[in-house]
Amino acid sequence: MTSNFSSTVAGLPRIGAKRELKFALEGYWNGSIEGRELAQTARQLVNTASDSLSGLDSVPFAGRSYYDAMLDTAAILGVLPERFDDIADHENDGLPLWIDRYFGAARGTETLPAQAMTKWFDTNYHYLVPELSADTRFVLDASALIEDLRCQQVRGVNARPVLVGPLTFLSLARTTDGSNPLDHLPALFEVYERLIKSFDTEWVQIDEPALVTDVAPEVLEQVRAGYTTLAKRGGVFVNTYFGSGDQALNTLAGIGLGAIGVDLVTHGVTELAAWKGEELLVAGIVDGRNIWRTDLCAALASLKRLAARGPIAVSTSCSLLHVPYTLEAENIEPEVRDWLAFGSEKITEVKLLADALAGNIDAAAFDAASAAIASRRTSPRTAPITQELPGRSRGSFNTRVTLQEKSLELPALPTTTIGSFPQTPSIRSARARLRKESITLEQYEEAMREEIDLVIAKQEELGLDVLVHGEPERNDMVQYFSELLDGFLSTANGWVQSYGSRCVRPPVLFGNVSRPAPMTVKWFQYAQSLTQKHVKGMLTGPVTILAWSFVRDDQPLATTADQVALALRDEINDLIEAGAKIIQVDEPAIRELLPLRDVDKPAYLQWSVDSFRLATAGAPDDVQIHTHMCYSEFNEVISSVIALDADVTTIEAARSDMQVLAALKSSGFELGVGPGVWDIHSPRVPSAQEVDGLLEAALQSVDPRQLWVNPDCGLKTRGWPEVEASLKVLVESAKQAREKIGATI
């Protein structure tokens, strides 16, 4: 008989409080450390993570993950892409035998492209997209995870293995032959039946966030049948998150599972009518995605109502992967600091609520939480603002095109980049020295001007048509603006994993947003003074600023987005006054916030489009507005991309083999567009044949008068030799394509 637990979290971060895994991975990749050292670092991190939950009575354990949980699952199931099969097994140094194929799939090799990468549901975390086919056969090998699990058991940790569930894995996979990944669902449940029986643990957790999305009834029937079989093992805990748990309960309640986890934050505490108290309800009442302190009194009241219906355990709404480790080392003004809870503070909140539910309430802690909630609610910095908004429309696109062609005088298939150029050690050093006050602001700005000199000169030498200043002064495309806008704060150590070794430090949007002074104008003016070619003004759009920040949850996102948009509108006006003829307002994250259920999508798409247009509609018709988008599965949002009414949209496309082109063609997209022809996420220089092929594919779907030639994304993370070589290929391909089409603008 499985014994219930009372307190846990859905999952834990893996990168390390000081980004230890990041640095170990990068050291291994560049050859400065051996595999044994990487393996040891990963083991130390999972031990530390388990120890952080010593006050809870059940500990989630996903093993040593070296890049991504979906990629881990593909490795365990033996379905890493076949093109990496020729990579030999790794030597026995503590890393899994398949680790080199695993890293090949994640990062690509000199000759093989990486797997596609996209956002995990509506979060800012990325996963590697599994590649399957109708002929895929699963070959189970969980030996590495089982070994890691035994190490935790030897340490006395009450660990439960955590797996990505069959429905979620297949729902997020793609096939290379057009078949439906979900056709493999019955077979994959059979594999999972063997997998979970191999764990010598009381509980096993299977994550199925796909169950909060729209799932076809016939698929839900298969899921119910599959989990009915898995439940016979005993101690099977199916966890859901990122949305209401009602559909999961309707599907899974009463089939013999030990526990079902539900998110009680994203859509609040819903009715959960299907739960009759037969299973342990793991109540995700502490927000795992955002950094605001929990209203402990309100949460406890909700938990008590649920506990009257059956057994419950207190948990987080999702894995703590999405929030920073701790507030402990942060120097944040006391008023706002009291409003916040990072990972370790959320673990404490779970413990406080579980104890209180058991009758052991910590009155002082509850009083402190109530005081913080009241302070945030009554602060002048969060008070509602009432104002009349300016218009959100420009002239017709045909009118704008005519004026812009005369103003810009660009060739056919104009070449450009997305914005950032390599953040070199000298740039990072200058920023660090400024932070430590070992150089003056004037010295720092002179160093940045020298970098801009280099970037402009390199672009002119390469023959690019529209230039950028390279953004050397920006540590991050959102954080840079957050540090210059009122209503935001930055953390010192608030790192979260974005993908693999890449970490980001999201700003905190805690109050009303405004722009006290111009933010980018002086850098644009300096860059434009160095060249006769057009230099783009570079801004980050309102939706992306929200998506990549921890955003206040005490007012509608639409209201906050409009506040950011008004600040950007002022900045655009100042850039135009300074001479900018092309201004790029990046919205790479516009799809990330798209709700997971169809019923919720129209409202989001309306306010996200409205906020972009509020930011850009003040630009005269002869000024060309660009936008850029990443990781966007355009079929779902193409009508909204058109509604943004940007003159040119650049899109990440190379890594997904130009799949975006079908959406563009079927939609009748008539605006300017630049589908990326160089995948900058893989550390390799594309061949001329590769870029020529992508550009030729683009020309078959897009009118040459609309088409721009550009990389997938910014070049911040790449090195100069690779950038120069790749851009040389890109520019030459564009020149040859111009000759073939024989067109000029």
From Swiss-Prot:
List the Pfam families hit by this protein, alphabetically.
Answer: Meth_synt_1 (PF08267), Meth_synt_2 (PF01717)
As recorded in Swiss-Prot or TrEMBL, the protein's gene is named metE
Record protein name field: 5-methyltetrahydropteroyltriglutamate--homocysteine methyltransferase
Q: What cofactor is needed?
A: Zn(2+)
Any binding details for the cofactor?
Binds 1 zinc ion per subunit.
Q: Which InterPro entries match?
A: Cbl-indep_Met_Synth_N, Cobalamin-indep_Met_synthase, Met_Synth_C/arc, UROD/MetE-like_sf
**Which residues are recorded as binding L-methionine?**
418-420, 471, 586
Q: Which residues form the active site?
A: 681
Binding locations of L-homocysteine: 418-420, 471, 586
Reactions this protein catalyses: 5-methyltetrahydropteroyltri-L-glutamate + L-homocysteine = tetrahydropteroyltri-L-glutamate + L-methionine
Biological process terms in GO annotation: methionine biosynthetic process; methylation
Q: In which pathway does it act?
A: Amino-acid biosynthesis; L-methionine biosynthesis via de novo pathway; L-methionine from L-homocysteine (MetE route): step 1/1
- Function recorded in the entry: Catalyzes the transfer of a methyl group from 5-methyltetrahydrofolate to homocysteine resulting in methionine formation.
